[in-house]
Design a protein with these regions (language model features):
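Small/polar glycine-rich anion-binding or flexible loop at a beta-alpha turn
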Residues: 306-316
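Active-site activation/catalytic loop segments of kinase-like enzymes and analogous catalytic loops
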Residues: 255-299, 315-334
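Conserved ATP-binding subdomain of kinase catalytic cores across diverse folds
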Residues: 26-30, 34-44, 49-178, 252-254, ...
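Conserved active-site aspartate in kinases
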Residues: 245
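Long, compositionally biased intrinsically disordered regions
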Residues: 357-360
Length: 369
């Protein structure tokens, strides 16, 4: 509790530097995120009503350049706000709104060197951690597709690449080969089947990257963390209203965002399921998501880019499995593990999903065409 009070004390001091409306009457830890320290602030306005804000300490161990990160967030949200207003929407609820410091900056560096930023809290909205019913997955797809559509004419190349080669599957494959060759903890001999599974799909790793290099698909502004809980759902309508957590917004491909949503949402198992007989790729949920995503993003996409979405589903799943297996071979240094072979179980789950996607891949292509 002392540690929590210390955090709140620091947070209160930091809050004095931001342009909040009204007087701060309450401050409490908020959410279950593991990367940033997040607090909700309640401010009482002159008319007696309350306004809520989010105040966050950014984790610069993960995001090494908070300045570039916040430049991306400011530029993208400013662009989105203009688009939403032009379309007659509600910019206070349909995009994140940054609260500036009293010096007019988008973030604050405190006396200890930590970086802080603040957003207006969007009231009367919620989010889901899991796909509980197809309608939820559809609504998240509509929201992510709308996000892509609004940013279709944003100059993606002008954004900072805040995490280098984040979804470069070719680079991930090369890192994997290096881990196999060095075999620093002597595990390679026990996972030959998994190693051969990845090696057999080397050509697949190049497909999306080559399509971009050849000009077949465009560079886009991508979210890069398209889990269902990064869409706020309006409490009254049940519809997705706002895409949140823009820390990984940077140049990328629509296939990345589409594919990561499918990887995390179109199955009925835990990411670290040790029993592979319980792992099932759900083609129906894939179709539900594709329908929602294309209903909003499809108008700005060429046939080649739509086709790349199916490849994105397979390759984001394969890439994630490669990362888990690479970490396992290197001694479990990157991903937190709770048991022996935890990363191996994670890798096997992703590879099982890839196999099942391959069995229905023609249907996956047809659905997005």
């Amino acid at each position: 509790m002392e540690h929590l009070n210390k955090k709140e004390e620091i947070c209160r001091k930091v809050a004095e530097s931001f342009r909040f409306a009204g007087k701060i009457t309450k401050m409490s830890p908020y959410g279950s995120g593991h990367i940033n320290d997040t607090f909700m602030l309640t401010c009482e306005l002159e008319d007696g009503s309350n306004k809520h804000y989010i105040l966050q300490r950014m984790n610069d161990d993960i995001f090494r350049n908070p300045k570039e990160l916040m430049e991306n967030v400011v530029n993208v949200t400013t662009f989105l706000r203009k688009k939403i207003i032009a379309a007659g929407g509600d910019p206070e609820r349909e995009t994140l709104n940054i609260i500036l410091t009293k010096d007019g900056a988008s973030y604050l560096q405190d006396e200890t060197g930590d970086y802080w930023r603040s957003y207006v809290f969007i009231d009367d909205a919620t989010c889901f951690d899991l796909v509980e019913k197809p309608e939820d997955f559809y609504n998240s797809a509509v929201a992510f597709g709308h996000f892509q559509q609004l940013l279709a004419d944003y100059p993606a190349a002008t954004l900072h690449e805040t995490i280098k080669n984040f979804h470069n599957t070719v680079d991930r494959f090369h890192n994997f080969l290096k881990a196999v060759e060095e075999d620093v903890v002597g595990r390679a001999k026990d996972v030959q089947a998994e190693i051969e599974f990845v090696k057999a799909r080397e050509a697949d790793c190049h497909i999306i990257c080559d399509a971009l290099a050849n000009g077949e698909i465009p560079l886009r502004v991508t979210h890069n963390d398209t889990k269902i809980n990064n869409v706020l759902i309006d409490a009254a309508t049940g519809k997705g209203i706002c895409v949140i957590d823009l820390d990984t917004v940077m140049p990328g491909l629509s296939a990345y965002d589409f594919g990561d949503s499918i990887r995390t949402g179109a199955n009925d198992c835990a990411e670290d399921e040790p029993d592979q007989s319980k792992v099932h790729f759900d083609l129906h949920l894939y179709e539900v998501f594709a329908k929602g995503y294309l209903s909003t993003a499809g108008a700005s996409m060429s046939p080649a880019e739509k086709k790349s979405l199916a490849w994105g589903a397979k390759l984001m799943t394969l890439e994630c499995g490669i990362r888990f297996l690479t970490d396992y071979l290197e001694g479990d240094h990157y991903f937190h593990t709770a048991r022996p072979d935890h990363n191996l179980d994670r890798a096997r789950t992703q590879f099982t999903l890839v196999r099942q996607m391959e069995e229905v891949f023609d249907q996956m292509l047809e659905i997005v065409s």
